[in-house]
Amino acid sequence: MVKLSLRTHPDVLFGFSNNYVELILRVENPGEHSVWTEADVAVPEHISLAPNNALRKGRIRVGIVAKNEFLEKAVRVYGNSYTQPQMYKCDITLYSFNRDGVIENRMEKSFNLRCEMKKEASL
């Protein structure tokens, strides 16, 4: 069974401006055989998976994770002028496939993305 952990870089998305954070998926495979992994990502309103339009769902092909190894894959989450400072709940569904192409495992995980006002530089 694979393990999924999530993090962002940078830690905070800034509100009311066009910027992005990278949501990084880390998939670990402690199992005895290699698996192919893909993930569905869903974001709420006012943030997007595309820089210029509203895209709320997407799929990431993480790749083949060999036994006792891990892979990391990043997806950009974009803010815009409608992105308010609050917590946004992102949903990730990870699928792992065996060598016959059959879904071996399905894992759902949520991640709270923090959005804040950008602090002005002070002297």
Which ranges hold each PLM region?
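Short acidic, flexible loop segments centered on an aromatic residue
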Residues: 30-48
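Beta-sheet-dominated interaction scaffolds and their linkers
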Residues: 1-30, 59-64
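Short acidic/proline- and small/hydrophobic-mixed sequence motifs that coincide with surface turns
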Residues: 31-37, 85-87, 104
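Short beta-strand elements
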Residues: 102-123
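Enriched for extracellular/lumenal, surface-exposed ectodomains of secreted and cell-surface proteins
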Residues: 92-101
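Short glycine/proline/serine/threonine-rich loop/turn segments at secondary-structure transition edges
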Residues: 16, 81-91
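Short, hydrophobic beta-strand segments
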Residues: 73-82
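Short beta-strand and strand-turn-strand segments in soluble, beta-rich domains
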Residues: 46-61
